[in-house]
From Swiss-Prot:
The gene is upp. This is Uracil phosphoribosyltransferase. Transmembrane segments: none annotated. 5-phospho-alpha-D-ribose 1-diphosphate binds at residues 78, 103, 130-138, 199. Binds 1 Mg(2+) ion per subunit. The magnesium is bound as Mg-PRPP. Its cofactor is Mg(2+). The keyword Glycosyltransferase applies. Its EC number is 2.4.2.9. The lineage of its organism: Bacteria, Pseudomonadati, Pseudomonadota, Gammaproteobacteria, Pseudomonadales.
Length: 212
C-alpha cells in the first residue's frame, strides 16, 4: 500500500518548528505530541461507524460510534513514547503495546529487546508510532513481532521518513499503511534522515543530541 505524506498546513507548520537546531526539549516534546495527534486523525479516517440510539435532551436521537476492531497503540521505544500522549488524546480507550527495538550503530541492524503487547492484540488494529522511519529496520522488526502475535491489521505513523526506509518496509510488508508528516530527502552515511529532525529520542528526553 502506498505511503501517505500528510501535507496539512498545521502539520507542515509544526514540523518546520521541530526542525530548528535550537529547539528546546519542552517545545520538541509538545510538537511531537501535536503532530502525532494530527497524524492519528488522518490514519483513522476510514474506521467503520455504526448507528445507535440515545436519550437526548429532546427525546431519542440516532448517533454514531466507531464499530469493528478495537485499537492498540504501539510505541517503538524509546522515541515513540514522545508521540503517545497525542495519539491517546484522540483515542483514550486504546490499549498500549510497547515494543523496544535497538539499532546497532555500526551495522544499522535492529533487534527487539522488549515486548509488552495487549493480550487480545490479534483482535485489534495496531497503530505503530515512531518519530523516525530511517533505515526501516526497527519498523520491520516491530511489524514482524506484531504479525507473529496474530495481529492482522497494522498501520504506522511517523513524523519523518526516508525514501530508503519506506522502500524497505513496503517491500517486507506491502499490506501495512504508512502515514508520515514528511518524506525527506535521504539517509546520510550514518543512517540518519536528511534534513530530518536530529536524534528525536534525545530531543524528547533531553539527553545528549547528535548531529544528523
Amino acid at each position: 500500500m502506498p505511503t501517505r505524506e500528510i501535507r496539512h498546513p498545521l502539520i507542515r507548520h509544526k514540523l518546520g518548528l521541530m526542525r530548528r537546531a535550537d529547539i528546546s526539549t519542552k517545545n520538541f516534546r509538545e510538537l511531537a505530541q501535536e503532530v502525532g495527534a494530527l497524524l492519528t486523525y488522518e490514519a483513522t479516517q476510514d474506521l467503520p461507524l455504526e448507528t445507535y440510539e440515545i436519550d437526548g435532551w429532546c427525546g431519542k436521537v440516532s448517533v454514531e460510534k466507531i464499530a469493528g476492531k478495537k485499537i492498540t497503540v504501539v510505541p517503538i521505544l524509546r522515541a515513540g513514547i514522545g508521540m503517545l500522549d497525542g495519539v491517546l488524546s484522540l483515542i483514550p480507550g486504546a490499549k498500549v503495546s510497547a515494543v523496544g527495538v535497538a539499532r546497532n550503530e555500526e551495522t544499522l541492524e535492529a533487534h527487539t529487546y522488549l515486548e509488552k503487547l495487549a493480550p487480545d492484540i490479534n483482535q485489534r488494529l495496531a497503530l505503530i508510532i515512531d518519530p523516525m522511519l530511517a533505515t526501516g529496520g526497527s519498523m520491520v522488526a516491530t511489524i514482524d513481532l506484531l504479525k507473529k502475535a496474530g495481529c492482522k491489521e497494522i498501520r504506522a505513523m511517523v513524523l519523518v521518513a526516508a525514501p530508503e526506509g519506506i522502500e524497505v518496509v513496503e517491500k517486507a510488508h506491502p499490506d501495512v499503511k504508512i502515514y508520515t508528516a514528511s518524506i525527506d530527502q535521504r539517509l546520510n552515511e550514518h543512517g540518519y534522515i536528511v534534513p530530518g529532525l536530529g536524534d528525536a529520542g534525545d530531543k524528547i528526553f533531553g539527553t545528549k543530541q547528535k548531529d544528523a
